[in-house]
Amino acid sequence: MFSSISRGFAKSETGDTFSFSFKSSWLLSLLVLWGPPLTTAKSAADYYVRSLPGAPDGPLLKMHAGHIEVDPQNNGNLFFWHYQNRHIANRQRTVIWLNGGPGCSSMDGALMEVGPYRLKDNLTLEYNEGSWDEFANLLFVDQPVGTGFSYVNTDSYLHELDEMSAHFIIFLDKFFELFPEYEGDDIYLAGESYAGQHIPYIAKAILDRNKNAVSPWNLRGLLIGNGWISPADQYPSYLTFAYEEGLIKEDSRTAKSLEVLQSVCQSKLETGGKDRIHIGDCETVLQELLSKTLDSDNKCYNMYDIRLRDTVPSCGMNWPQDLKDVKPYLRRADVVKALNINPEKKSGWEECSGAVSSSFLPQKSVPAVQLLPSLLESGISVLLFSGDKDLICNHVGTEQLINNMKWGGGVGFETSPGVWAPRHDWTFEGEPAGIYQHARNLTYVLLYNSSHMAPYDLPRQTRDMLDRFMKVDIASIGGSPADSRIDGEKLPQTSVGGHPNSTAAEEQEKERMKQAEWKAYAKSGEAVLVVVIIGVSVWGFFIWRSRQRHRRYQGLYHEDVSGASVLERFHNKRSGQDVEAGDFDESELDDLHSPDMAREHYTVGEDSDEDDVNRQHQRTTINPS
């Protein structure tokens, strides 16, 4: 941006060097002083997604994407994709979604589960009617470094959960510097699978940060689906689940051979293994279970959805079927450009990184289940949900985790000594949906007919689950509420689908954005531009007045028309551009899109960042997710 401005002052229109007066030298000094921030510091506009190839017809959803540096020494950058909420309920909320692995991209969640779009094919996006961005801002992050679109030097992959959470706090600090309007939101950390380790560690790191923070973050809840949270409870569950689901017959030869392996695993757990996150002898149980249950076509069970079969040795790694479209879509050059991927990211997008996974084998970190009691006791609400057809992180293990955990003066779902909270039948739109159970800040939901990636199978039901957990109040919004019932009784209204905002909600949002406006200006460097423009204006006015005053004194002041041309060229250079766009020239904007991209949809004027300001004064084996 500075180079664009300073070029306007270098020459007159005829090419002659412009001779600065004392006043113009003062202005140039001001520009030089402020130059480095203008050229190096990114603003929110640098992350703005102006178009998205294959998007449905109509205005594009408001979104930002790109990299935030978390480890300068090792070139560590985390990629994020953020969607602004489509409707405003009673409170402003942000849901941060993480997939597992470790080393599997949260683009799984964005394009196959809870994001606003799903792929119809590798060229075309369609709306996800159960998207989680309806009443919450939605933030997907590829982490740890090296995952998905994120990157780091190849000798600097992470090993421990504390390292991961430290990076994440740095990421959030910088994210909120760029987007201060979201810093006061209620924050919910959500994800699945190995994110069952990541999420509690990040939550603890946030609470630790808040102790000394000038602006504490409003962490309200955690949502973990089919989570790898307690290996000591999950490893022994494989055989139990296989028996219950009829994958293996008890007392069969196969069962007996697997029980021998299970006893070795149990011995490891009882001799220090309960404080470990990965135990090789226990991993063997699942591997052998899959290899000993091949069908007549020599296909194994899909470990993420036992209703399906897959080729050996994948056994689920080729699932879900949408994955065949996600990878080529995210490797398209126009998509990479639209999502503001840094040139330093040399390799194309991969769902799961083997290098990250093989490096992230914590030796010092304790299982995240040991962090849950203190989080619950601190007032953080926790929702554990399980798709009932998942094998690898099955619901039997999750239920055993809850039964064994002590917090808040009780064990498991005790409501009083020896008395447990009842299980409630949940129906959604007239069909059995699952089971709800709750006690002392912990909620458990078993989702019928769903896999390791429950939102993939049941987008509307899981959205309803989210809204209830966040206590979304849609009274002021309207629309047709979903028919969701517990034990036959209709629950407080939630809605799934598009609905207009209420006037009151819009006014509340405008006021919130107005309060954040100057903070956003100051952090993005726009205030600097305002100062420069004011300086130019004052200087120009002073010169004009002086010339008018002394015009009658012939020869005393020689009128140099180049001064006027500077201001004119400056105005012409900047007009028609986003005020936050730096030196992003309009011709460069045209270069973003190739001529054959006629089906892409661009945001209309009122959806740009600049107009918001004007308008609002506004996948180890745990992978693939």
From Swiss-Prot:
A cellular component annotation (GO) from this entry: trans-Golgi network
Q: Which GO terms describe its molecular function?
A: serine-type carboxypeptidase activity
State the EC number(s). 3.4.16.6
The record's region (Disordered) falls at: 480-511, 574-625
Q: Which residues are tagged as glycosylated in the record?
A: N122, N441, N449, N501
Reaction(s) the record says it catalyses: Preferential release of a C-terminal arginine or lysine residue
Compositional bias ranges of the Polar residues kind = 492-505
The way it spans or sits in the membrane comes to: Single-pass type I membrane protein
Pfam assignment, any one: Peptidase_S10
Q: Where is the protein found, in the record's own terms?
A: Golgi apparatus, trans-Golgi network membrane
Residue ranges annotated as transmembrane are 524-544
Q: What does this protein do?
A: Protease with a carboxypeptidase B-like function involved in the C-terminal processing of the lysine and arginine residues from protein precursors. Promotes cell fusion and is involved in the programmed cell death.
* The protein's name: Pheromone-processing carboxypeptidase kex1
Top-level taxonomy: Eukaryota, Fungi, Dikarya, Ascomycota, Pezizomycotina
